[in-house]
């Protein structure tokens, strides 16, 4: 068979599998050196067995490992016997299907050999091209099979494609699918090259829906629209449309060289892949498989392999109409400092680096040109084109040390879609991506110029603080200074925009939540940039907190470097400039929890609604009631967050998704409200009250009574007060997070008020601060850690899934230990377990245990029988003793009672008379045993009825005649005879051996009882 031949199961495959040179099919089959000619059908030949019978008797064939090698192996061959088995089992064979050879006791290896012989003969006779001289077949097939079991499948049936296709065309079509848009991008030089780097994934649909300055061929538009259908029509065939005309449009070698072998060089480097449905319009199939993270090539290889056909420029083109650039596109300070980088290096930049690079340029340009911001105040969301130097500069800032080595599977696309409903209501700068419902370009930074202007207005006042203020994907108050003014009953600097400005239009993109963030601001220059690695956004995600690896959770970061983009729990309260939606009374003051509806849905409503629907929120009207204060929901919004918060925050997020966020309507003042207020303030801003007490309360102090002393949120004016804030925040946060986590994981809505002031001491010396910091590993809890939890008790501080797993593990351990103890006890109890010299298995132990139990039961039964017999003998002896004692006189005087004496004398006479008569004839004993009850033992017996005290013979004769008339009847004698026969058959072996009856009688005569 040729090497290109399709091999089905059951084939004999190859004659010489070790040969490199494959013989031509039309040539003669090459025979190996065999002693037995009968094995040629198994090795390489199908000739007839017409050799000498002497060859049939030789049991060995020598199998060589190739033509040019001298090694050989001896194989035991019994194919002549197998041939006889075939002829016996099948006189006529019709098909070469697998045969079990039922009725023949064959080893499974022999059955495989027989089926291989049958297939080989069938292949030579019907399938193979016949050579010049036809060979005599080994097996005769009566009729070739009509079924298509072993026929070569010539046409692939794929979703309605029933035509026959060539393998080259299928391969070419598959390769075109792998890089399906490359050909279109080469022809359309002006288009954006979408390589799905970390900085941009272009949406072809967004391009097509915008107005073009030049015409596009209709075929290109149709192909693009066909490739990027929304997911409602995902039931359609995913197979690309078959077009015979362009099947060989370009050379196959060019297709083969697109993805080079350089992909395998850096498989260990992690790469942040977006959601697969968000990059549904991406053009590269390799990055549409985010689940196979370690197997993906790095983006540098994709860029370099496609580098010849791509324009050497960033993926944002200012000359095209794909984006609108703002008017302040003048060279800024950073444009002259950051050098031009190579394009291929830019592909490894993550989302965070793109945000930082653009934020640097935008903040500098905003500071230098504050007057131009008023022109863009009306534009709510505006695409911003990244400059080439920003695009290149962001490529060298990637740090893979803190990126996860595997992508968590807990962030499902459905979760991301469900958390998107309030995304467009937020006025913070966002990143739009093309989901199924998107019509605009993806991953493009969209800036809210109104927010930026307001942010700029505070830059002069709180410049160091605003530099430290970080973007928080958790529910955040983006502008701390504005919230501070609200909480201090001061009027806001900029009036809140109207409701109509906040609501998006129909053309706004449907934003995924995992790309929403506030705009990151530049970090202070005092910190070493190499010491501030970027945390991946999924590390802080509440959706992935339960499945993180222990290393990713328990990695302690420097205190000053907790500045990466935070995670997307969704902006529960973020839509106006101050971070709240004002509905009703806009009077500044405390925020009241109410059931009124607004435009931003909560996370619980998002998780329970369809993807597109937008429900109401629980954060409603802001009334002039300063009793309740709802502090910032940010997790790391203070200037110097400590590493203590990482683990506790992950535990809070893990538990809050399951229990605490499932609230639809919360009434102020209820325990539910208090617990919710405690749960969402895992790390609230530090509350300071003018009271003299130094006690800082725990989570129960979040709803504070502020009628006399309205609290304020301290925002440090400079970086010099960081250490004081850190020392002041360290100890309260420990207890606050612990109690909050315990309450959340227990599911209790009542918040425990911690009143002991000793629990909340403030560390004043560096030694105390170090002691608090050293307790950090005790507070860390990784929900996905497996080995560390095995030795812990399933207390209430664990995640419910982890608690369930630990309980299940303990139950399994108890079950296995009970089984082991039981088997150990059996091995100690049962004798002769080690008689074979080998340690017995559990099955042997159980089998011998059953035998031992049966033997013990048999012994118990035998001993029970002996005990019963002994009890019967004791009973008879007691009766004998009783009868003898009853016959004794009551005194030494002569007895006057003659009745008892006469009965006893008659019994004694009967026994003596029976013994004497049985010695003469053994049959006399048999008759006496039958008559003994009626004569002696019964109450109406002869001995008790006949008057023995009378000296008159007439009276004795009269009593005898009366007794005979009453008792000597057949009805009385028949039961006695049957009872005797039953006792003889039971106590002796007369039924099997009747000759032993005389011996039995003699043995009973010797018995004293």
From Swiss-Prot:
InterPro entries: bHLH_dom, HLH_DNA-bd_sf, Max-like/E-box_TFs
Bias (Low complexity) ranges: 511-526
Tree of life domain: Eukaryota
SMART domains: HLH
GO cellular component: cytoplasm; mitochondrion; nucleus
GO molecular function annotation: DNA-binding transcription factor activity, RNA polymerase II-specific; protein dimerization activity; RNA polymerase II cis-regulatory region sequence-specific DNA binding
Region spans: Disordered: 1-20, 304-354, 488-531, 686-728
Location within or outside the cell: Nucleus; Cytoplasm; Mitochondrion
PROSITE patterns in the cross-refs: BHLH
Tissue expression from the record: Expressed in intestine, neurons, muscle, hypodermis, excretory cell and other tissues.
Pfam families on file: HLH
Reported phenotype of the disruption mutant: RNAi-mediated knockdown reduces lifespan, which is further reduced on daf-2 or glp-1 mutant backgrounds. RNAi-mediated knockdown causes premature onset of polyglutamine-mediated paralysis. RNAi-mediated knockdown increases spore levels of the microsporidian pathogen N.parisii during infection, on an mxl-2 or mdl-1 mutant background.
Compositional bias (Polar residues): 324-350, 499-508, 686-695
Keywords assigned: Cytoplasm, DNA-binding, Mitochondrion, Nucleus, Repressor, Transcription, Transcription regulation
Gene3D superfamilies recorded: Helix-loop-helix DNA-binding domain
Region entry Leucine-zipper, spans: 856-877
One GO process term, biological-process aspect: regulation of transcription by RNA polymerase II
Domain bHLH: 803-856
Function description: Transcription factor that binds to the E box motif 5'-CACGTG-3', probably in a heterodimeric complex with mxl-2. Involved in modulating longevity in response to TOR signaling, dietary restriction, the decline in protein homeostasis associated with normal aging, germline signaling and the insulin-like signaling pathway. Plays a role in autophagy. Involved in regulating migration of the ray 1 precursor cells in the male tail, acting in concert with Wnt and semaphorin signaling pathways.
Protein name: Protein WBSCR14 homolog
Organism: Caenorhabditis elegans
Name of the gene: mml-1
